[in-house]
Amino acid sequence: MTTTQRTAVVTGASSGIGAATARRLAEQGWAVVAAARRLDRLGALSAEHPGIRPCALDVTDPRSVEALADAAPSCDLLVANAGGAFDLATLADADVDTWARTYDVTVLGTVRTVQALLPALQASRGQVVLTGSTAGRWVYEGGGGYVAAKHAIAALRDTLRLELVESGVRVSEVAPGMVATPEFSAVRFGGDQDKADAVYAGVDALTAEDVADAIVWVATRPAHVNVDLVQLTPQQQAGVHKVVRRPPTP
């Protein structure tokens, strides 16, 4: 008796949570289409595991998203992970173009990707897992653009859950708190690595692998189980303004 190999598409797969998720899925026997803008990094990722196939993707470009759908005519799982935060400006000082970029990548990019892959997901009675954030439920000063985008992701998850329930497609969200990834905070601070490192100072933060483990767990529940939301945080983070920072152990 043979078992058909399942296919997963992971966006934002060139680094961080996306790359870790692609690895975890491939380790469990999935055929993984790892999609992102940086093909050099995807090539290195696919070299690690024969089950990972790179695919160039810019989620802000409809033609690029259509090409992704052509590259994955069969799809059992979409991990819509592409997104970003590009500023920490207050609402009074915010640059509208920066907010538009955040929304285009994080929200509209997710919409484009889901739309393109939905026929394949419906055919397989598959699953959509959105990478959310505690920023989709918590708010903080200077985070308005990113917070609004991640609140929108939470709303998309709720909407898709209602709209796809009759099709058999499952819809889930994995929403991490503080995750120490090499690039996320550095991009947000305009490349100032010292400021980026200070975000996680004294905190045993989540890793990309921690979040990937949660995504893979959600994606491997029995078909009759829909995990609506998994929110995970470091033990030291009980809220956006409740983070216990401890000095490093000698």
Residue ranges of each PLM-predicted region?
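Active-site helix of classical SDR
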Residues: 114, 149
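The beta1-alpha1 cofactor-binding region of Rossmann-like NAD(H)/NADP(H)-dependent oxidoreductases
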Residues: 56-67, 96
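Alpha-helical segment proximal to the catalytic Tyr-Lys
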Residues: 119, 162-163
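Conserved glycine-rich cofactor-binding loop
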Residues: 14-15
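C-terminal helical subdomain
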Residues: 173-174, 193-241, 245
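Residue(s) in the substrate-gating loop at a strand-loop-helix junction
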Residues: 133
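Substrate-binding pocket helix/loop in short-chain dehydrogenase/reductase
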Residues: 89-91, 95-100
